[in-house]
Amino acid sequence: MGQIKSVLFDLGNVLAVIDFYKFWSSLGFLRPEEIAPFTDGYISWTRQFESGFVSTNEYLTGLHSVFGRSFSVEQLERAFASIIREPIDGMMEVVKRVSREHRTALVSNTNEIHYKISLDKLDVLGVLPTHYLSYKMRVMKPAQGFYNAIIDDQKIDPSEMLFIDDIPENVNAAKSAGMQAICFEGVEKLNTSLKGFLGSL
């Protein structure tokens, strides 16, 4: 097991609260049966958007069609942007502390709309010098290509990287790529885990 040189932080529900339901409620959909007819189209377009296969304009136009043109493109963009909520308390301090002695980076399945909103709302992103973004890399976690691209760019052994994510599937994929990894379950548990990997901070 290599000594940790680089710590990689996920964005959603690690650095910031993400509320996927906010998209639907912002458009007035409050019950599962109201949402269900549009779910497949929404998920399909969003995966293409976060994989970098469609532009922001193409994505919003696609959603416009999914919803039968019931909402304006502007309404859809505002609703989609509203998914990004507040910073998670305590994570700025964690990132700053880790950054004193380790390389740090953002690793996120995201898109142009959410990334721009996050830059405006989340000061912690300014502390992370490198941002690995699925829509720019054209590959999403948990595909091995996502992790391999990071390993190639970091130019260190994957065992010297510590990957932090709230989704077990993404954490397991990082381990399969040779990285060390933590499944995020809150700041207190993360601090305990970090001491085990990094020693005193």
Segment roles from a protein language model:
Residues 1-41, 66, 70, 176-177:
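Active-site neighborhood of HAD-like aspartate-dependent phosphohydrolases
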Residues 6, 74-105, 116, 144, ...:
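Short, acidic loop-to-helix structural element flanking the phosphoryl-transfer center
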Residues 6, 140-168:
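Conserved Lys-Pro-Asp/Glu-containing loop-to-beta segment of HAD-superfamily phosphomonoesterases
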Residues 10-13, 52, 98, 106, ...:
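Generic structural signal for small/hydrophobic residues in well-ordered secondary structure
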Residues 14-15, 20-22, 110-113, 137-138, ...:
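Short, solvent-exposed loop/turn segments at secondary-structure junctions
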Residues 30, 89-136:
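Substrate-recognition/cap helix-loop segment adjacent to the acidic, metal-dependent catalytic center
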Residues 46-90:
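Metal-dependent phosphoesterase signature
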Residues 158-194:
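Acidic, Mg2+-coordinating phosphoryl-transfer loop and its flanking beta/alpha structural elements
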